[in-house]
Amino acid sequence: MEPKRVAEGKTKIVYEFDPEHYLLRFKDSITAGDGARKDELPGKGTLNAQTSALFFRLLEKNDIRTHYVGMYDEKTMIVTKLKMIPVEVVLRNIATGSIVKRLPIKEGEVFDPPIVEFFLKDDLRHDPLLNYSHLQYFNLLTRKEAEIVEEVIVKVNAVMKNFLKERGLVLYDLKLEFGKDKDNNLIVGDEITLDSMRVRDEKTNKILDKDLYRKGESLEVVKKAYEDFFNLISR
């Protein structure tokens, strides 16, 4: 008997597990353009679940709290129940994507220190940019909480940049989502996968993330990139 379904998004399904935990099952779906484009990529759910679990374990080893508890099966994680905040927190090390369209910034510019941005999770409005005042007005995060979130994502970035650099990879940017546990602590939730970061090969500048799909590459090319990436980080 399948557990009770709590919620379903574009790429994941949340199920009840026990009073303290959910099951987070990764689907084989891949999307772009706020869900405007969608395909099925067999095996992607397993790859993303395993990738996310690896990164969550890495963060936990570096004293960064996440919702990850363990694996239920190959594409399903057991996670701590959180009250998720509908905000995407994006950290950018190197300019690419939307920032070069919104601002007079050239592709490939290096941000030192990194730039942190907040976006409302709202597909219909294409995830609008938020500042501290917006976060407070919509009762999403207080100024203090926003600053804590910034500190956490900067620490996550440092850990992941170093981990990937050791494997010949460059972290251009990453997106995190946060939630609050029963004690009101801010915890890293959701996922950490190639759907939520941009990674390039250090020597060839080859794209290894969902930008391949955004740019119209075949599903075979996208899947191979995800597989190659997982093999690299699993060493």
From Swiss-Prot:
Entry keywords, A to Z: ATP-binding, Ligase, Nucleotide-binding, Purine biosynthesis
Gene3D superfamilies: ATP-grasp fold, B domain, Phosphorylase Kinase, domain 1
Xref: InterPro entries: SAICAR_synt/ADE2_N (IPR028923), SAICAR_synt_PurC (IPR033934), SAICAR_synth (IPR001636), SAICAR_synthetase (IPR050089), SAICAR_synthetase_CS (IPR018236)
Known EC number: 6.3.2.6
Catalytic activity: 5-amino-1-(5-phospho-D-ribosyl)imidazole-4-carboxylate + L-aspartate + ATP = (2S)-2-[5-amino-1-(5-phospho-beta-D-ribosyl)imidazole-4-carboxamido]succinate + ADP + phosphate + 2 H(+)
Pathway(s) it belongs to: Purine metabolism; IMP biosynthesis via de novo pathway; 5-amino-1-(5-phospho-D-ribosyl)imidazole-4-carboxamide from 5-amino-1-(5-phospho-D-ribosyl)imidazole-4-carboxylate: step 1/2
Gene Ontology terms, MF aspect: ATP binding; phosphoribosylaminoimidazolesuccinocarboxamide synthase activity
Cysteine pairings via disulfide bonds: none
One of the GO biological process terms: 'de novo' IMP biosynthetic process
Catalytic EC class: ligase
HAMAP family attached to this UniProt entry: SAICAR_synth
Family as reported in the entry's similarity comment: Belongs to the SAICAR synthetase family.
PANTHER family recorded: MULTIFUNCTIONAL PROTEIN ADE2 (PTHR43599), SI:DKEY-6E2.2 (PTHR43599:SF3)
Protein name (record): Phosphoribosylaminoimidazole-succinocarboxamide synthase
Species of provenance: Sulfolobus acidocaldarius (strain ATCC 33909 / DSM 639 / JCM 8929 / NBRC 15157 / NCIMB 11770)
Encoding gene per record: purC
